[in-house]
C-alpha cells in the first residue's frame, strides 16, 4: 500500500492529501484511543496558521480546499458508505474558515470567502439539515452565509 500511495511532489501539506488514502485502502485498521501521530509546530511550520490565525493566506487556504475536495471525491468512490460524512467534513471545514476569516478580519482571503459562501449557499439544505452538522455550525451558517 505504501508503494502505491505516495506523498505528492507539489504542495506544502502532504499529509492532508495522503493520510486518508491509507485508511481508505487498508484491509484492517486498529484503533486503541491513544494518539500516535504528532509533530512539532514551530513558527516556520507550514501549518502554523492552524494556531496563529493571522498567518492564514489565500495560497494555503486554496490548497486545503482543493485537498478537501479531492478527499471527498476519493472517499466517495472508495468507500461510498462514507460519502455523506466526507461531504459534511468538506463543508464543515469551509464554514470554519468562513468564521475564522470574519473573526480575524483576514481580508486577504476575501475571494475565497466569497467562493466558500457561494458553495455553502448552493448546498444549504444538504449541509444545514444534514445529520452530521453541529449546532455551532448552524449558528455560523445563519450569521455568515445566509
Give, region by region, the residue ranges found by the protein language model.
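Secondary-structure edge/capping motif, primarily at the C-terminal ends of alpha-helices
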Residues: 43, 50, 75-78, 98-105
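Amphipathic alpha-helices of TPR/Sel1-like and other helical repeat/solenoid scaffolds
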Residues: 63-74, 116-121
Amino acid at each position: 500500500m505504501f508503494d502505491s500511495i505516495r506523498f505528492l511532489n507539489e504542495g506544502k501539506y502532504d499529509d492532508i492529501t495522503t493520510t486518508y488514502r491509507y485508511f481508505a485502502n487498508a484491509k484492517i485498521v486498529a484503533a486503541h484511543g491513544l494518539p500516535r501521530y504528532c509533530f512539532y509546530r514551530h513558527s516556520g511550520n507550514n501549518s502554523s496558521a492552524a494556531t496563529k490565525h493571522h498567518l492564514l493566506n489565500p495560497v494555503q487556504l486554496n490548497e486545503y480546499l482543493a485537498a478537501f475536495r479531492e478527499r471527498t471525491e476519493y472517499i466517495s468512490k472508495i468507500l461510498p458508505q462514507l460519502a455523506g460524512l466526507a461531504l459534511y467534513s468538506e463543508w464543515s471545514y469551509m464554514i470554519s474558515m468562513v468564521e475564522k476569516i470574519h473573526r480575524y478580519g483576514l481580508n486577504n482571503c476575501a475571494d475565497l470567502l466569497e467562493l466558500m459562501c457561494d458553495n455553502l449557499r448552493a448546498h444549504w439544505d444538504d449541509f444545514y439539515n444534514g445529520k452530521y452538522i453541529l449546532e455551532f455550525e448552524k449558528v455560523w451558517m445563519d450569521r455568515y452565509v445566509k
